């Protein structure tokens, strides 16, 4: 790639040569030429992290976002008329071109772009030069698009300040200001909708159940509970959802994406709610309190299970024999008596399994394969569940909580053993 200014041309890292061109000198502009469509990411403008509207993951910049979106099917290429770079989405092309319109528009005329020349003077490395100076911070930058990136940083700061003060934002005047909190809006209907946060007004009522909402979009989303409408379908497995965010979360099962990281132990999670629950291991929070005895719990499900002690309720009924249970996991364990079949046979030892995953994991006993390795200590395991269980040694996580007393354990077997203390006391 070659950059040309009034003073010279940049043809590679640290490569700067004088180019005599009257048009270039008079207009004091920058022209850009890219010799190949698939230009590398080095030296190209970088933006802040951007989310994929199709499946949810957050990418570090517009180029990584567009590369990721190319994995989705049925998308057409959009080409930048100035440099030839191709994008899967037109919106990404526009975002890419914005970088050049911060101060100087990107040239599109072919005759003007013809002044760009390749460096043929010498193949030897030249002393690194930094001909561009940032007016905001007096920092020097090499003759790369990094200067453009720096301008974008300051542009964002100015935009943020402009938004806070109620000035124009992207050409819109922020005429409508909230009298409660001072937040400004460009449209009156947006202000009216915002003010319902303060007033508590909920004008949109569900005709089926009477539940009210502050936004019409939320009512439409709620009504799908009654209509059974599930318009968002997973392209991988065909499962449908009533909400787009639920589909986005579900897709992480297929992609393996885990965008939420715990700052304490570095563990990753696919759902933000799972991260919040996990962080209670570190901060000791127990937000769920029993109204009968005052005991507190880390998980809402544990509180619900605990409350059955006071009510004597056994809400989980077996559809096969009618037996009822106080806990859902106890019902699931019981139902295996009625439903379990074992179609998967190991040809090595003749053992049968009800699930293919158990069969595959069992075969590793014979092959010696241990594909799941702990990144902390290097210990390897046959099953991913065994690795997850082992990692609690390093993280200190104790996800199994006693519904009687709130004591937590790292293994379900330890919780079961502990709960016998309570059941023995009631006999």
Swiss-Prot record:
Record gene name: ZNF134
GO BP, one annotated term: regulation of immune system process
Keywords, sorted A to Z: DNA-binding, Isopeptide bond, Metal-binding, Nucleus, Repeat, Transcription, Transcription regulation, Ubl conjugation, Zinc, Zinc-finger
Record's protein name: Zinc finger protein 134
Record-level GO cellular component terms: nucleoplasm
PROSITE patterns named among the record's database cross-references: ZINC_FINGER_C2H2_1, ZINC_FINGER_C2H2_2
GO MF: DNA-binding transcription repressor activity, RNA polymerase II-specific; RNA polymerase II cis-regulatory region sequence-specific DNA binding; zinc ion binding
Cross-link (Glycyl lysine isopeptide (Lys-Gly) (interchain with G-Cter in SUMO2)): 20, 135, 139
Reported function: May be involved in transcriptional regulation.
Homology family: Belongs to the krueppel C2H2-type zinc-finger protein family.
UniProt subcellular location: Nucleus
Origin: domain of life: Eukaryota
Start-end of C2H2-type zinc fingers: 50-72, 78-100, 176-198, 204-226, 232-254, 260-282, 288-310, 316-338, 344-366, 372-394, 400-422
Organism: Homo sapiens
Pfam families assigned to the protein according to its UniProt record, in alphabetical order: zf-C2H2
């Amino acid at each position: 790639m070659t950059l040309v200014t009034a003073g010279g041309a940049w043809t590679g890292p640290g490569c700067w040569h004088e180019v005599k061109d009257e048009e270039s000198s008079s207009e004091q502009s920058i022209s850009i030429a890219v010799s190949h469509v698939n230009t590398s990411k080095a030296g190209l403008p970088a933006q802040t992290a951007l989310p994929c509207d199709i499946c949810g993951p957050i990418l570090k910049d517009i180029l990584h976002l567009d590369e990721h979106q190319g994995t989705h099917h049925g998308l057409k290429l959009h080409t930048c008329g100035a440099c030839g770079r191709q994008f899967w989405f037109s919106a990404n092309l526009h975002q890419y071109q914005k970088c050049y319109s911060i101060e100087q528009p990107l040239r599109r005329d072919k005759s003007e772009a013809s002044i760009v020349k390749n460096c043929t003077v010498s193949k030897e490395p030249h002393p690194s030069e930094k001909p561009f100076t940032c007016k905001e911070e007096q920092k020097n930058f090499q003759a790369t698009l990094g200067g453009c990136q720096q301008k974008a940083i300051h542009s964002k700061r100015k935009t943020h300040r402009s938004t806070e003060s109620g000035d124009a934002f992207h050409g819109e005047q922020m005429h409508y200001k909230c009298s409660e909190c001072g937040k400004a809006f460009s449209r009156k209907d947006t202000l009216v909708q915002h003010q319902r946060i303060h007033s508590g007004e909920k004008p949109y009522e569900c005709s089926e159940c009477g539940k009210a909402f502050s936004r019409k979009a939320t009512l439409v989303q709620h009504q799908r509970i009654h209509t059974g409408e599930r318009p968002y379908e997973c392209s991988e497995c065909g499962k449908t959802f009533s909400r787009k965010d639920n589909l986005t979360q579900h897709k992480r099962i297929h992609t393996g994406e885990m965008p939420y990281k715990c700052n304490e132990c570095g563990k990753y999670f696919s759902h933000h709610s799972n991260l919040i629950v996990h962080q209670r291991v570190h901060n000791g929070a127990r937000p769920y309190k029993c109204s009968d005895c005052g005991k507190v719990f880390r998980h809402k499900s544990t509180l619900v299970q605990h409350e059955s002690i006071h009510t004597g309720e056994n809400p989980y009924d077996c559809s096969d024999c009618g037996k009822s249970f106080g806990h859902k996991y106890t019902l699931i364990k019981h139902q295996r008596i009625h439903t379990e079949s074992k179609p998967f046979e190991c040809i090595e030892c003749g053992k049968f399994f009800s699930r293919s995953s158990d069969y595959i994991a069992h075969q590793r006993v014979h092959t010696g394969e241990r594909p799941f390795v702990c990144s902390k200590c290097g210990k390897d395991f046959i099953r991913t569940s065994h690795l997850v269980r082992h990692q609690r040694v390093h993280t200190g996580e104790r996800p199994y909580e006693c519904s009687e007393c709130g004591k937590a354990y790292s293994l379900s077997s330890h919780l079961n053993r502990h709960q016998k203390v309570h059941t023995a006391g009631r006999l």
